[in-house]
Each structure stands twice: as C-alpha cells, then as structure tokens.
C-alpha cells in the first residue's frame, strides 16, 4: 500500500510585508534581499491568526480538493516548530475545527525538514495498513519567533500552511532517505521560551530564531544534492525520469546550486519563495499545492521532494503523483 496524493491545499494570511517594509525596520533594501535570497514579500499573520488557524485553513482546502469528508480521515499529522500551545497539539486543534472525530492526531517537530518527515511517517502508517486516509499538514507562524531587529534572519521568514490528503491504495511508489547531523545543531537554533524565568533575562534574545547563515548555506548546497543522488541511485531512477524537484523554499541560491550539482535544468525546480519567504515546515506543501492547482502535475509524474533545516536534518523522497 502507498499513500496516493488525492488532495492538496494551502493557506496564507492576507497581510503581506514586502522588502521595502522591512527596509523601514532594519538596515537593508529590496535589492539586497532579492539578490541574496530571492524573497520579495512574505505573509505575516495577525494576532488572531495562529498556527491552528492556518493549518485548519489549508486542511479544509485539501479535503475539498480530495472530495473527502473530515470523518473519513483517520490520521492528522502536523509538522510545526511554532505551535499555538505546547498542549494540546496543533493537530488536535485542527481535528476540532474540521470535525475529524475519527482521527488520531499528533505534531512533529522537524524544523524545515518537518513536512518531509511527516510525509515519511504518514506513508509508513499507510503502508502497514494502520490507517487508511491521512491528512499531513505543515504550518508555521514564524513571525512570532523572528527577531525583527536582526537583518540576517528577519528578511527570510514568513507565515503560512500547506496540506495534503493521502489515501492508501495498491500500487504506486514511495521511497525516502533522511539524515541527521546533531553535532552541527548549533548552526540553527530556537531556544524554548519556557526557560525564561524572570524579567529582563539575558537569555531572552535566544528565544528567537538564531542562525549561522554561512554554515547553513554550506550545509544545504552540499547535502541536498547528496541526498537526492543517494535516493535516485538506490531506487535505480535517473534524473531524466523526474518531472519536478520540489525543494524546501529557503533560498533561491540554494535551489539554483542544487540544480547545477544535479546537472538538471532549473525549469524542473519550481520556486515560490519570492511570494512567501521561508515558511519552514509549510514550504514544501504550499509549493505542492500550487503545482497541482496550476495544472503542472500529471498523474504518473515522478516527483522528488527534498527538505533541510534545523537539527541539522536533511533528506529527500520520491513519490509518484
């Protein structure tokens, strides 16, 4: 059994901040941001728009696309590093809003690799016949975890959610490789805010996303192509057999570098970070939804999905659409 993609959806806040808005907050410019990241704008959630709001919004659209009722879903898995609450989990909040009373629900924290890890997890459950219909969501409200005085990070991130409905069916194919490098975890961190015990705690700065940009960039441009090559080699699939490579939308330069290292044309690497920025766990599923809605995906297409991020973690999966 394999989880077949039968519906996708995405949701982003209406409020948009472009690069010129950020130039009023920190020393930067539209040109500087575009040249280094490819980002032009990002969606920023309002106070009453939390991770559950976005996750449920994307999930509803995915269910509509799949022509499936919420009661038919028996697994809801949410990848996020920005939950509204530690408990209950975001997935339970989504269950409540959808009325998916038959679903088992839990969250997964895999940072920017989160949606890939969530897909792997859901596929494993479906393959074993434990569940029949899975709703996988990546949702982030990164604006609340971003230091808006730090030019090195605030230009990157945005808010949003993506979702996919997987139905267990005979046939199809799914394969994946994932790796973790815990010893390099310090390159990209977000300290728990539960550790702040008193006012004016000197650790307060650490409660925002902290990143060694050069180290993360070097990691991504080398390890992502490495994972893709490992996956295709193991599955005895050539690059020519791949219709599209959907990579985590962190930085345009990373994706262009991956295309070069794989010897593939950049046209096979769709990008949308110009409109969303880096949405961490949400980015792959937002991109997948846009590809489906635009009519670019055809049944039988072979897709490579690749993620990389905090941990450090990285990996790739091969799925037949």
Give the label of every model feature segment.
Residues 71-79, 239-248:
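Short glycine-rich phosphate-binding loop at a beta-alpha junction
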Residues 26-35, 85-99, 135-142, 195-202, ...:
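Acidic-glycine-rich active-site phosphate/pyrophosphate-binding loop
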Residues 16-17, 87-89, 146-150, 314-318:
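Short acidic, glycine/serine/threonine-rich loops at helix termini
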Residues 127-161:
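Flexible, glycine-rich active-site loops centered on histidine and acidic residues
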Residues 4, 74-77, 135, 243, ...:
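Conserved beta-strand elements of the Class I
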Residues 79, 109, 134-140, 166-167, ...:
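Short beta-strand segments
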């Amino acid at each position: 059994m394999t989880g077949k993609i039968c519906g996708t959806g995405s949701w982003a806040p209406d409020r948009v901040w472009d690069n010129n808005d950020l130039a009023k907050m920190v020393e930067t410019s539209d040109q500087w941001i575009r040249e280094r990241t490819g980002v032009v704008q990002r969606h920023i959630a309002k106070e009453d728009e939390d991770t559950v709001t976005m996750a449920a919004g994307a999930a509803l659209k995915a269910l509509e696309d799949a022509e499936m009722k919420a009661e038919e879903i028996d697994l809801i898995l949410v990848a996020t590093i920005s939950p509204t609450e530690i408990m209950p989990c975001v997935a339970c909040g989504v269950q409540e809003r959808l009325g998916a009373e038959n679903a088992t629900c839990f969250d997964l924290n895999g940072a920017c690799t989160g949606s890939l890890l969530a897909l792997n997890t859901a596929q494993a459950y479906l393959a074993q016949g434990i569940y029949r219909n899975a709703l996988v969501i990546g949702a982030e409200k990164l604006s609340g975890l971003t230091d808006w005085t730090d030019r090195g990070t605030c230009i990157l991130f945005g808010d949003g959610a993506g979702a996919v409905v997987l139905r267990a069916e005979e046939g199809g194919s799914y394969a994946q490789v994932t790796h973790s490098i815990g010893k390099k975890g310090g390159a990209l961190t977000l300290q728990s805010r539960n550790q702040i015990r008193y006012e004016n705690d000197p650790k307060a700065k650490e409660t925002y996303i902290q990143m060694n940009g050069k180290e993360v960039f070097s990691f991504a441009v080398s390890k992502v192509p490495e994972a893709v090559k490992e996956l295709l080699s193991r599955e005895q699939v050539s690059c020519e057999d791949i219709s599209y490579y959907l990579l985590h939308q962190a930085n345009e330069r990373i994706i262009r570098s991956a295309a070069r290292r794989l010897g593939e044309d950049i046209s096979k690497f769709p990008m949308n970070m110009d409109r969303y920025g880096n949405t961490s766990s949400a980015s792959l599923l937002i991109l997948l939804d846009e590809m489906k809605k635009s009519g670019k995906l055809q049944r039988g297409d072979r897709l490579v999905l690749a993620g990389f991020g905090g941990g450090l973690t990285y990996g790739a999966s091969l799925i037949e659409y």
